[in-house]
From Swiss-Prot:
Residues 22-105 are periplasmic. NCBIfam families: PRK00888.1. GO terms for cellular component: cell division site; cell septum; plasma membrane. HAMAP family: FtsB (MF_00599). This is Cell division protein FtsB. The chain crosses the membrane at residues 4-21. Keywords: Cell cycle, Cell division, Cell inner membrane, Cell membrane, Coiled coil, Membrane, Transmembrane, Transmembrane helix. Residues 1-3 are cytoplasmic. Essential cell division protein. May link together the upstream cell division proteins, which are predominantly cytoplasmic, with the downstream cell division proteins, which are predominantly periplasmic. The gene is ftsB. Belongs to the FtsB family.
Length: 105
């Protein structure tokens, strides 16, 4: 009976070692779960970006309004006959520019 008990204890110890510290053990499971969570977060961000780009493509394919808005905002274009007015904030509201210095060395 003593040899069987010793054999079962050794087998139990080996199984516990492989469960906690061995390949595909608990440490690997925790690492893989954190990797999966990080990848799912990255996938969600990329999906949101893709959805935004697809919506922009649909807007651009849908008509001239989106193209006109984009050309006005990004390129500063205006229609023929329009007058462009630029509103400049007051000096106190603008960020002060860095003073230009010259080194006379």
């Amino acid at each position: 009976m003593g040899k069987l008990t010793l054999l079962l204890l050794v087998l139990l110890g080996w199984l516990q070692y492989s469960l906690w510290l061995g390949k595909n053990g608990v440490h690997d499971l925790v690492r893989v779960e954190s990797d999966v969570a990080a990848q799912q977060s990255n996938n969600a961000q990329l999906k949101a970006r893709n959805d935004q780009l697809f919506a922009e493509i649909d807007d651009l394919n849908g008509g001239q309004g989106a193209i006109e808005e984009r050309s006005r905002n990004e390129l500063g274009m205006i229609k023929p006959g329009e007058t462009f007015y630029r509103l400049v904030p007051e000096q106190s509201k603008r960020q002060p520019a860095a003073p230009a210095t010259q080194d006379n060395q």
